[in-house]
Design a protein with these regions (language model features):
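Intrinsically disordered, low-complexity non-transmembrane regions of multi-pass membrane transporters
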Residues: 1, 28-29, 75-110, 239
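Structural signature of hydrophobic alpha-helical transmembrane segments
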Residues: 1-14, 61, 128, 132-145, ...
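Hydrophobic, aromatic-rich alpha-helical transmembrane segments
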Residues: 1-9, 29, 52, 56, ...
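Transmembrane alpha-helix boundary signature
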Residues: 49-57, 73-83
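Internal active-site segments that recognize and position negatively charged phosphoryl groups
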Residues: 98-164
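Transmembrane-helix boundary and interhelical-loop signature of multi-pass inner-membrane proteins
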Residues: 18-31, 48-54, 153-202, 209-217
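Alpha-helical transmembrane segments in multi-pass membrane proteins
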Residues: 7-19, 23, 39-40, 44, ...
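Long hydrophobic alpha-helical segments typical of transmembrane helices together
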Residues: 197-239
Length: 239
């Protein structure tokens, strides 16, 4: 029975509710500094994930082709619209105090970045696949601890809308967990390493975005995740 993704979802909802309730009670300097730390942690974890690559050319090609596809499909623009709709829907259901965000554009920018950080992190992906294969959900429990505090801090500025992130995250994790049984027999260690490395690249980009260092179109890079394993397999076979 798969339970890890649902525990992770409850952690996000709980953290978001507490953070939205606390709001301005948390000092601005603490919210700002912790947001920077979350971005730094994202980049740090991303670097560790990138180090797992087996075929660097396959990793780079996946990121390049995936980003081109995402840019042509305007994925981030679509996610922005969904994020805006979700924000309005959630705030109607759970009235929130005025957000400290300076603009809707700033809200969307951070919202998209944390959707990627929560839903497509290497920890979540590996944890979901690991539970599907072995039934061990310890990795997702650890991720739930981290996500609880991350959601709480982000909700102090983004509001209760952060709770809605549990929807894409749970969807991704449940699909991965239930499909792992069918996928893993065909996945080599090399493919797994290159897949983790591509996810790490996205986490680094998300970290830069959260820290407002460089506004990568992270959502437009998502197709790279789906290209990573096929390209890795092709490269290992014919190189």
């Amino acid at each position: 029975m798969i339970i890890g993704p649902y525990i992770n979802a409850l952690a996000i909802i709980g953290g978001a509710v507490i953070g939205a309730a606390l709001g301005g009670r948390i000092p601005e300097r603490l919210r700002t500094n912790l947001t920077l730390i979350f971005g730094l942690c994202s980049m740090g974890m991303g670097i560790v994930m990138v180090a797992k690559t087996t075929n660097m050319p396959a990793m780079i090609l996946s990121v390049l082709l995936g980003t081109i596809i995402g840019e042509l499909l305007l994925l981030e623009q679509g996610i922005n619209k969904l994020a805006s709709s979700a924000k309005g829907l959630v705030e109607k259901m759970f009235p929130d105090k005025p957000s400290s965000m300076n603009s809707q554009e700033e809200f969307l920018s951070k919202f998209v970045a944390i959707v990627v950080l929560f839903s497509f992190s290497g920890t979540g992906i590996f944890g979901a696949m690991n539970e599907g294969m072995s039934g061990n959900f310890d990795i997702l429990i650890v991720k739930s601890f981290l996500d609880f505090f991350t959601a709480m801090i982000f909700a102090t500025s983004l509001g209760i809308s952060v709770a809605s992130i549990f929807v894409p995250q749970t969807l991704v994790q449940v699909i991965l967990a239930y499909s792992a049984v069918f996928i893993i027999p065909f996945v080599t260690p090399e493919m797994r390493g290159d897949f983790a490395a591509v996810g790490g690249m996205l986490m680094i980009a998300a970290g830069f975005r959260i820290c407002n260092i460089q506004m990568f179109h992270v959502a437009n890079m998502l197709p790279a995740l789906f290209l990573a394993m096929p390209i890795s397999h092709f490269w290992s076979t014919f190189s």
